[in-house]
């Protein structure tokens, strides 16, 4: 049985607001600022452009989640050393149970010293939410804010509670109903 969490219309506006600190600027400025704040041991990136540009400034995310698209257009990021590569299907506007399990598995691999890349077949736009839920406290999750910059989330108990609340307010869909 497939289970997914679907973003309802009433949450879409809320999620357009950054979940963390917005670092504004043209590329590479936000990534150079990011490098001053975080180190690779605590970095999780969500999105092709974010992952690619983090790597370009010398950061090596422990977990990178991307879908070979940017703003719903095909995109082939320049991403070199991957570590373990996992793939998962995740339709737009959803968080599938499979994505949740894959992110959880990625963190168990990271605890063993491996960097992990998850390539999403579909869309990873909501993946920052489960990335925060499963991330160790003190980690940093970064995702893109189109035409503005990047959003930096420091993973705290409060931040995890907020993401859990978002998940609770999503519509649960079983077997595509």
From Swiss-Prot:
Q: Which domain of life is it from?
A: Archaea
* UniProt keyword annotations, A-Z: Coenzyme A biosynthesis, GTP-binding, Kinase, Nucleotide-binding, Transferase
Q: Which Pfam families match?
A: DUF359 (PF04019)
Chain sites annotated for binding GTP: 48-50, 67, 69, 124
Q: How would you classify this enzyme at the top EC level?
A: transferase
User: What InterPro entries does this protein's entry cite?
Assistant: deph_CoA_kin_Thcocales, GTP-dep_dephospho-CoA_kin
Record's keyword annotation contains Kinase: yes
Describe which pathway this protein belongs to, using the record's wording.
Cofactor biosynthesis; coenzyme A biosynthesis
Name the catalysed reactions: 3'-dephospho-CoA + GTP = GDP + CoA + H(+)
Record keywords: Glycosyltransferase included?
no
- Record EC number: 2.7.1.237
Q: Which GO terms describe its biological process?
A: coenzyme A biosynthetic process
Q: Which residues cross the membrane?
A: none
What are the GO MF terms of this UniProt record? GTP binding; kinase activity
Task: Show the NCBIfam families listed in the entry.
Answer: deph_CoA_kin_Thcocales, PRK01160.1-1
This chain's function reads: Catalyzes the GTP-dependent phosphorylation of the 3'-hydroxyl group of dephosphocoenzyme A to form coenzyme A (CoA).
Please state which protein family the record places this protein in: Belongs to the GTP-dependent DPCK family.
Q: Which PANTHER family match?
A: GTP-DEPENDENT DEPHOSPHO-COA KINASE, UPF0218 PROTEIN TK1697
Protein name according to UniProt:
GTP-dependent dephospho-CoA kinase
- Origin species, per record, is Pyrococcus furiosus (strain ATCC 43587 / DSM 3638 / JCM 8422 / Vc1)
């Amino acid at each position: 049985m497939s289970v997914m969490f679907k973003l309802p219309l009433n949450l879409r506006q809320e999620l357009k607001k950054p979940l963390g600190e917005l670092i504004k600027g043209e590329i590479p400025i936000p990534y150079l600022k990011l490098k001053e704040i975080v180190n690779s041991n605590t970095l999780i990136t969500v999105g092709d452009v974010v992952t690619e540009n983090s790597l370009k400034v010398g950061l090596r995310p422990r977990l990178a989640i991307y879908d070979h698209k940017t703003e719903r257009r095909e995109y082939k990021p320049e991403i070199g050393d991957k570590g373990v590569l996992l793939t998962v299907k995740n339709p737009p506007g959803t968080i599938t149970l499979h994505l949740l399990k894959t992110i959880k598995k990625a963190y168990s691999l990271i605890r063993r010293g491996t960097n992990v890349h998850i390539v999403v077949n579909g869309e990873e736009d909501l993946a920052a939410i489960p990335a925060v839920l499963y991330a160790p406290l003190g980690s940093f999750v970064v995702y893109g804010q189109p035409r503005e910059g990047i959003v930096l989330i420091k993973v705290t108990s409060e931040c995890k509670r907020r993401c859990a609340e978002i998940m609770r307010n999503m519509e649960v869909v079983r077997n595509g109903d």
